[in-house]
Amino acid sequence: MSKNPLYANEIATAHQFVIEHNTDIKLQNFLHDMRYRTDLTHSDRWSLCYDFLNENYPEASGTIVTGLAYWLED
């Protein structure tokens, strides 16, 4: 997972979001699939996170999308 210090707050917010929704199988499957996608650029990963969260968690903020995209990067 990315340790990019410029996005530490966003990553922490995304991590908290994942903890709060840890029983959601859709979210867990999405996270698992994204972890092993080595073919994605950051922009691709951000777009997929945005689409997933917009569809399943429309209340999720842009901070969560950005944090999740960085958190899932190696």
What do the PLM-derived regions correspond to, one by one?
Residues 16-74:
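Acidic, low-complexity, intrinsically disordered interaction modules
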Residues 2-23:
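Short terminal alpha-helical segments
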